[in-house]
């Protein structure tokens, strides 16, 4: 049966770059690997074909010869003493030629002989704890007590997993390597040892308290210092307070993620605070003062300029939130909301009507608006 064109095998054009060739090879190799196609007898042959094509096209000299002579470049008779396999005989060591690709695809695949398991001790996992605080607590800083369920080192075996504190022994399945090898057609594949789970050691007499795990589940009570200035999304790291390590390995870390609750009066934007303050129509028109609360528990008197409109903002410097890492505090912005009176008495209504008759020149924005409306309609009808 005639060999297929190598470019066709990889599904690329003849002008494909080295990166495009490698990407195409990785895709094909992953798709056709015997481990993933145990029920497809043709996959192994196709897998070999893909490897053969890539072995040629990845090498600049072989590729040049193939582009010029085709498959004949690798068969007997093409000058230069290539022997029965031709000038570029297919005797490459695929284990070394493709190790960089397969390590990406399948993990520790096609490696050398290696040694014992890299580390019998394993670091514990990191933990996440979501903690809600009030805006007042975020302003002042606070000490919080939290309960964290986590795996901790077993007291009975001191984390070894063995009864009576005995030492683990070398795994008989992998001889301490943590991996086992299996032949898959054309290749030798390494997998994590199923007996010791890659640890390289086993426990002959498991601890009765932790069943050989070396860890037990336990709820711990921790005290956490929340600094002033935290905001939603702030992350606090507590080193060594995560899951306990395996076989004497170090513990992971605990990460506290802060969520600041909404406040009834203040809205926050970084270090600045906003407060919407209602004022009477007379105070807005004539001017006056209003007392506003501040986040520190006090209050400040703010002057309202005569003629203030809804939305007017005034700033109280330094009355916002403290910066988390120092640098002073933000500001507090006060936004006026002019209230329209409701439930008017007959006398109040009478006074307002009288006021309206006298206030034609006192509403500049309204006058300007209606002038624009008139101009708009005149333009439509003219």
Curated annotation (Swiss-Prot):
Pfam families: DnaJ (PF00226), DnaJ_C (PF01556), DnaJ_CXXCXGXG (PF00684)
CXXCXGXG motif repeats: 154-161, 171-178, 193-200, 207-214
GO CC aspect terms: cytoplasm
Annotated CDD domains: DnaJ, DnaJ_C, DnaJ_zf
InterPro entries on file: DnaJ (IPR012724), DnaJ_C (IPR002939), DnaJ_domain (IPR001623), DnaJ_domain_CS (IPR018253), HSP40/DnaJ_pept-bd (IPR008971), HSP_DnaJ_Cys-rich_dom (IPR001305), HSP_DnaJ_Cys-rich_dom_sf (IPR036410), J_dom_sf (IPR036869)
Sites where the protein binds Zn(2+) 1: 154, 157, 207, 210
Residues in CR-type zinc fingers: 141-219
J domain: residues covered: 5-70
Gene Ontology biological process terms in this record: chaperone cofactor-dependent protein refolding; DNA replication; protein refolding; response to heat
TM region(s), chain numbering: none
Molecular functions (GO terms): ATP binding; heat shock protein binding; unfolded protein binding; zinc ion binding
Key word Coiled coil present: no
Predominant place of localization: cytoplasm
Textual note on the cofactor: Binds 2 Zn(2+) ions per monomer.
Superkingdom classification of source: Bacteria
Keywords, sorted A to Z: Chaperone, Cytoplasm, DNA replication, Metal-binding, Repeat, Stress response, Zinc, Zinc-finger
Subcellular location: Cytoplasm
UniProt KW Glycoprotein keyword: no
Binding site for Zn(2+) 2: 171, 174, 193, 196
Oligomer and partners: Homodimer.
Function: Participates actively in the response to hyperosmotic and heat shock by preventing the aggregation of stress-denatured proteins and by disaggregating proteins, also in an autonomous, DnaK-independent fashion. Unfolded proteins bind initially to DnaJ; upon interaction with the DnaJ-bound protein, DnaK hydrolyzes its bound ATP, resulting in the formation of a stable complex. GrpE releases ADP from DnaK; ATP binding to DnaK triggers the release of the substrate protein, thus completing the reaction cycle.
Family: Belongs to the DnaJ family.
Domain notes from UniProt: The J domain is necessary and sufficient to stimulate DnaK ATPase activity. Zinc center 1 plays an important role in the autonomous, DnaK-independent chaperone activity of DnaJ. Zinc center 2 is essential for interaction with DnaK and for DnaJ activity.
Name of the protein this chain belongs to: Chaperone protein DnaJ
Native source species: Cereibacter sphaeroides (strain ATCC 17025 / ATH 2.4.3) (Rhodobacter sphaeroides)
Gene encoding the protein: dnaJ
């Amino acid at each position: 049966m005639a060999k297929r064109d190598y470019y066709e095998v990889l599904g690329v054009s003849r002008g494909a770059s080295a990166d495009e060739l490698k990407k195409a090879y990785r895709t094909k190799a992953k798709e056709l690997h015997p481990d993933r196609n145990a029920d497809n007898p043709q996959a192994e042959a196709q897998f070999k074909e893909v490897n053969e094509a890539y072995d040629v096209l990845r090498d600049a000299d072989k590729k040049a010869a193939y582009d010029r002579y085709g498959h004949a470049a690798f068969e007997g008779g093409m000058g230069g003493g290539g022997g029965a396999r031709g000038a570029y005989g297919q005797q490459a060591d695929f284990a070394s030629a493709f190790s960089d690709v397969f390590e990406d695809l399948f993990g520790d695949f096609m490696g050398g002989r290696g040694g014992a398991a890299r580390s019998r001790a394993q670091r514990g996992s990191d933990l996440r704890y979501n903690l809600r605080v009030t805006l007042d607590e975020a302003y002042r800083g606070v000490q919080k007590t939290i309960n964290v369920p986590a795996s901790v080192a077993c007291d009975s075996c001191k984390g070894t997993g063995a009864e009576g504190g005995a030492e683990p022994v070398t795994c008989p399945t992998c001889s301490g390597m943590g991996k086992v090898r299996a032949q898959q057609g054309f290749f030798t594949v390494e997998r994590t040892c199923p007996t010791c789970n890659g640890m390289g050691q086993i426990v002959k007499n498991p601890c009765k308290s932790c069943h050989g795990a070396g860890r037990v589940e336990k709820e711990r009570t921790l005290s956490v210092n929340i600094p002033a200035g935290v905001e939603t999304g702030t992350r606090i790291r507590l080193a060594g307070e995560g899951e306990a390590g395996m076989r004497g390995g170090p513990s992971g870390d605990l990460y506290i993620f802060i969520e600041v609750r909404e406040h009834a009066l203040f809205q926050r934007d970084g270090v600045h605070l906003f407060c919407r303050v209602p004022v009477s129509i007379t105070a807005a028109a004539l001017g006056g003062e209003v007392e506003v609360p501040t986040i520190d528990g006090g209050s400040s008197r703010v002057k309202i300029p005569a003629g203030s409109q809804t939305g007017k903002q005034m700033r109280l410097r330094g009355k916002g939130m403290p910066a988390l890492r120092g640098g002073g505090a933000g500001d507090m912005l006060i936004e006026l909301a002019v209230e329209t009176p409701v439930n008017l008495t007959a006398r109040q209504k009478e006074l307002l009507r009288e006021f309206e008759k006298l206030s034609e020149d006192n509403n500049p924005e309204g006058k300007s608006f209606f002038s624009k409306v008139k101009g708009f309609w005149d333009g439509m009808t003219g």
